[in-house]
Amino acid sequence: MNGTEGPYFYIPMLNTTGIVRSPYEYPQYYLVNPAAYAALCAYMFLLILLGFPINFLTLYVTIEHKKLRTPLNYILLNLAVANLFMVFGGFTTTMYTSMHGYFVLGRLGCNLEGFFATLGGEIGLWSLVVLAVERWMVVCKPISNFRFTENHAIMGLGFTWFAASACAVPPLVGWSRYIPEGMQCSCGVDYYTRAEGFNNESFVVYMFVCHFLIPLIVVFFCYGRLLCAVKEAAAAQQESETTQRAEREVTRMVVIMVIAFLICWCPYAGVAWYIFSNQGSEFGPLFMTIPAFFAKSSSIYNPLIYIFMNKQFRHCMITTLCCGKNPFEEEEGSTTTSKTEASSASSSSVSPA
């Protein structure tokens, strides 16, 4: 083993020199330069500085404007709530611990940070899955005359919380565990050890299959079918410039969604799986730290993609920020009108939300 395993921690450094110390009790500056901890603290501060106002604004604007309180936007709000969970439950904790150079909050703090970060990330992930299924059901109409109602939205919300809890709760009750990872300033699922009594192997396999591969397959299937539906609608009206424009816009939106999904989760999942399947191999603390915190940046670009590309929401947001007046109202209105005309073949559901 090319690391040091202790009670409720694993440090990616052999203790041949005797300098390895518990990440709950001592600064870990022997792992990386102290400047790296300062950089991590600054990065977390940036995520808080950007993530909180973006997601809070999403909630505030939706509450203020009644026309935004639609069933589909319930899921978008759920995404914002999930991101706020990550901001308050994960980012603030990591910023504080990185200031000290170790997980100063102890074992209980590690459990709480790992739980809230995992819960927020999983709620966000499954919210994207529900959005993908909704787009597929409405646009492609596998069930004729299907209409996404408030009851469907509530069921979708319940499903996201159930699925997220099914991933975040088990490490708290003995199926796997949360331990400090990377630079030892944040906590995640134990991919690193085969500690007796925790069944880490079975939980990691369950987590990858049920909470990564299945969501990925569903998202690809739904958006793949959505692209086909848009192309078919455009082919039926080849002389309509607005339809062709709608096809290009939706194609661009879907490509951005899928790429963001992959960029957010694949590096972290790939590194975690490598560590799990090559336990005992040599790797540095930054090997897991960089993809883990890159995945956490989804709290910023998720709302930008899934909400700010929504013309109606953007109009309401600008109106709120400009004290009741949208200086771009005419442009926004004409764009929305053309979008509605272009998407008539699919009941105006081709355009983003």
Swiss-Prot record:
Q: What does this protein do?
A: Photoreceptor required for image-forming vision at low light intensity. While most salt water fish species use retinal as chromophore, most freshwater fish use 3-dehydroretinal, or a mixture of retinal and 3-dehydroretinal. Light-induced isomerization of 11-cis to all-trans retinal triggers a conformational change that activates signaling via G-proteins. Subsequent receptor phosphorylation mediates displacement of the bound G-protein alpha subunit by arrestin and terminates signaling.
* GO cellular component term, pick one: photoreceptor disc membrane
List modified residues, type N6-(retinylidene)lysine.
K296
Source organism per entry reads Solea solea
Give the location in the cell.
Membrane; Cell projection, Cilium, Photoreceptor outer segment
Its name, as the record gives it, is: Rhodopsin
Q: How is it modified after translation?
A: Phosphorylated on some or all of the serine and threonine residues present in the C-terminal region. Contains one covalently linked retinal chromophore.
Extracellular-facing ranges: 1-36, 97-110, 174-202, 275-286
Q: Which gene does this sequence derive from? A: rho
The cross-references to InterPro entries, in alphabetical order and at most eight, read:
GPCR_opsins, GPCR_Rhodpsn, GPCR_Rhodpsn_7TM, Opsin, Retinal_BS, Rhodopsin, Rhodopsin_N
Q: Where is this region: Disordered?
A: 329-353
Note the PANTHER family from the entry.
OPSIN (PTHR24240)
Q: Carbohydrate attachment sites?
A: N2, N15, N200
- UniProt keywords, alphabetically: Cell projection, Chromophore, Disulfide bond, G-protein coupled receptor, Glycoprotein, Lipoprotein, Membrane, Palmitate, Phosphoprotein, Photoreceptor protein, Receptor, Retinal protein, Sensory transduction, Transducer, Transmembrane, Transmembrane helix, Vision
